[in-house]
Amino acid sequence: EQVKIRFRASADNVDRVYLVCNGEKIPMDVEDGNKLFDFYAATITAGENMINYYFEIHSGRVTCFYNKYGVEKENNNDFNFEIYPGFSVPKWAEGAVFYQIFVDRFCNGDPDNDVLDNEYFYINSGTKQVKDWFKYPENMDVGCFYGGDLQGVMNKLDYLQDLGIDVIYFNPVFVSPSNHKYDIQDYDYIDPHFGKIVVDEGSVLPDGCRENKQSARYINRVTNKANLEASNQFFIELVEEIHKRGMKVILDGVFNHCGSFNKWLDRERIYEGEEGYENGAYISADSPYRSFFKFHNECEWPYNGSYDGWWGHDTLPKLNYEESDKLTEYIMNIAKKWVSPPYNVDGWRLDVAADLGHSAEYNHRFWREFRKAVKEANPEAIILAEHYGDPKQWLRGDQWDTVMNYDAFMEPITWFLCGVEKHSDEFRGDLLGNPDAFIGAMNYHMSRFQRPSLGVAMNELSNHDHSRFLTRTNRKVGRTHTLGPDAANYDIDKGIFRQAVVFQMTWPGAPTVYYGDEAGLCGWTDPDNRRTYPWGREDVELIRFHKDMIKIHKTYEALMKGSVLFLHGAHKIICYGRFTDNKQVIVILNTNYEDVDLRLHVRRVGVFNHSIMTRVMLTNEQGYTLETVDYMVEHNILTIKAPKMSAMVLVRK
């Protein structure tokens, strides 16, 4: 297949341009141009192998190089452009607006499925049914349940649709004993506490009892086939309704580890002797699931607790894929099952994906097989991974589509606007308002993505693992056990938060709203970041602001799919452009407590002389306005005053 590669240079600014492709130096010819730019082009033949390239530019006696990191005096091959033939991501995901729901804390639509007091024992305590919806999470919150469920999500679909949401991402929803459900008990079924309980028999644990073998009510609720099948059926109906509204659904895939309650291990002896279930690997050395886990003491059966736990957590047994083809096959079938009829989920978010397996070699092998399985079942399903650090080796077209964008989004914008780390664990005054650090971090970490992956990267300000962004605006270091939950609400700055949302909705990728952020929810890091959605106590102005920014994001193709280029960086100011061939958007963030006069060279993003730039959004410390104001570009420069503590979005007419 013939592939044309183009290079843009300022008109009459360079003498020669070469495409250096897989080591071959190819002259590029001027194909066309306008009064601003010359466009050089070269055509290459693509096969099945990766294409690696950069540009060499000559202007008089000056030679420079251009790669993903930008213009360099010497080329660094680590930043070369790459094309992986056949690699594509779902088109529906590019620029799509995601909404993350931690189900137990979103909305209680069915009180009949609520976890009961002392229904079972989990991590040093009997379960607690929290009856005050607005009560702050306890410091040891994992066994406290507020009653949020999938019926609650169904009840609030009108709200999500009106907000402008395209994709709902659920934290885990499969049978699990914790409220976060990253300790899967049964991958085949939706937890009836989130779904439907149609047969509700048995008693809760007696006072003081820690033996879950006696938790008759819980055992019935999560093993009774009527409850499990009714819950799966309700999930089918929920996905159908979401799809009818033009939205998608993403599930959380926890495949590195499961839970100690899992039927394959059964440390709690919940499934022992139950009809239709075989002995778990904890119960017996003869269990058909023994190879699913790595045991360190072969002499402890029955009831062998020497299994390998993820990071030493005995409630999170690590899955032993290398020694169990049966386990691998099972998980691949799970991956296919939920993206196929009748469930028809639109993709997976993969928990701690780089940790899976016991070697890097096996990890990559597993995800290649996983991608093949999922894409064969549903070619339009997205595969996005939780990942900290350089994702490049997984984003080569054969494993993940993209990642949760910590390094090239959440972390840099948090440092720039708030000066704190994303857990609120550290303050760095040298990074607060530092444009060089911000732009450098963004350019470097974005260079680790393939272009398709960057366009669908999950851009979050907050999530279930980090402090709420609105709390970060108070620039305090703390957690709920050090400063207390009330402190997360104090000294917050909604003006800074609005700047962050403007950035989120105008930056390349898929902006992802963590439930409640749009309603003014605060919170320190886990577990305080998992407060309930404040129904009836919402910050209506912030919801309206999110709705308006989402509308702006969707209105302009340049914000959904356009290129990005930094135009200006100064103390506490950043400015960038998003642009396609025929549409340009300019964004200005001024975090100074004074107005700043700017002269922006906008020709680099394709804004011609005498163009009119129309302001469509202005935020400030008190609120925001959609009142439009026009600015004329003269001598290829946009002269504009950026008000103190503001964010501006301008669109070329």
In which residue ranges do the predicted regions lie?
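Conserved alpha/beta catalytic core and glycan-binding cleft of carbohydrate-active enzymes
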Residues: F261-W264, A335-K336, P342, W367, ...
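Short, solvent-exposed turn/loop segments enriched in Gly/Ser/Thr/Pro and often Arg
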Residues: V103-R105, I168-H180, D252-N262, D351-L356, ...
